[in-house]
Amino acid sequence: MRYCKKCTMPDTRPGITFDSEGVCSACRHYENRKNVDWDARFKEFEAYCNKYRGMNGPGGYDCAVAVSGGKDSHFQVWMLKEVMHMNPILFSVEDNFPMTQAGIHNLKNISEEFGCTIISCKPNIRAQKVLMRKFFEKYGKPTWYVDRLIYTFPLHMAAKFNTPMLCYGENVSFEYGGCSDKETYSAMDQIENGVAVGFPMEELVGDGVTENDLSLTLAPSAEERAKLDPFYMSYFVPWNSYKNYQIAKEHGFH
């Protein structure tokens, strides 16, 4: 087994690569941040926001954010609502597990603090129970059903609400090492990053689970996805989880 000589990331991380000096791609990407013109990137972000600003008329939502209620979600919503003066709608996926008091507070807080509507998907509990057991026993991935919805639900909702500008936090493959080594603003291919890949429907149905129960796990059609313009916030601003936490804390995050 190989480990990155800088951060000790092992080669068991899917898609991770090492250069001739034994340093992982994530560390090299971080080092290259100093060469990025972040002022120019922010101007790109302003132009990107202006492209969609007010697109659905007065009072209409002009962008969307996939949120969990965590520190990064707070940062993303703060950036779009308070800094860029957009009007975001938020999409969230529950997991049907008991939530901590902090978790309950944080998801409520992100709506109350920034004055945003959250549309939350509470997955089909019967299907989740069946699929958790099946995917644990067969693939070692008990949470696949919920993980998949986290990727697909915001896309479906962005299409329904006509909010092509769908915000995600960081490009996990680029920031931490993974399937894609390309730095891009576009999150269009995020659904293919290997975290929650799709499975053939015949693998999923059975034991009381039908295709009707699984419609949201399917990605939107190619035609619908072509109308969307999802993006990574980490492309436009230097991504820093601790600074995100500090901003979130200032706005009521527990």
Predicted regions and their residues:
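Nucleotide-activated chemistry modules centered on ATP-dependent adenylation/adenylyltransferase
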Residues: 1-63, 79-254
